[in-house]
């Protein structure tokens, strides 16, 4: 009897160990899932070995079926995938080259939130930077992919958030390790410790961006502000007068054309000069506050086609403005809408009418003002 009980206990232990093993393996990857290639180009290989053969080249945006995953000797995670080519090639690809369908779906939700908001500005990356699902960098869980240096995009909004304390993040430049790789932070920390410490900022700026498929399969996401260079159009960049341009839209743009093309790397180039509405913000050496306005002045720049020169059509008094900037109407009958903080601190919609006087000069009527036209004698 004792022998029978011992055998039964041993069998129960073996079954429990097998269940634990299977459960542990299932957490490595979700089977029957799909993913999209985020690398510009990558190879599906015959195995995870260094000497494995290349079976199929895939490009950014290609979809693959994820069947399993494993960890290589160097700690890199690899996915066993099936390609969507004619022969449905099966092989292995590094996990860092793949974005899961679940993450892509979350990025599409972000894009849907701002689908009706026109581009407020355009920008490009100063260096290779992470595209994230949320505006915070204390960890790597919200990283979707790493964007290449020089990547261009539309900016649809921005947000100031409390800056993480230095001990809460080792990614001061938002340069996180590749997904699936072993993190080795000790050397980085020692290097940072040898450098002079700069005063910690109390909060930091993040941009919410819209991206072309050629740049990222994820249509939207958040980028750490210090890695972004605003690409102010060459037509207006020399009209900055001590304040930074934070948003801009052409007033004479074809309404059937896209609001902003970011396919070309040099997104600051404009085909021809024109009239613009520009939102400005005063420069300051003081730390920015979380609740400060997005802009504090409106600048409308007209263009004289005959003399081929710009002129100031309107410059508002200082105000506390809130994005987004929306342009409405067609031809000479246009207006733009913003939000302005009132005395009670609540933003209220303000509509500015754009028109031309009898001499053809561009004018702007602020809310509550009538259009001023010069009577002909």
Language model regions located:
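Short acidic/glycine-enriched loop/turn segments that link adjacent beta-strands
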Residues: 74-77
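Bacterial N-terminal signal peptides that target proteins for export
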Residues: 2-14
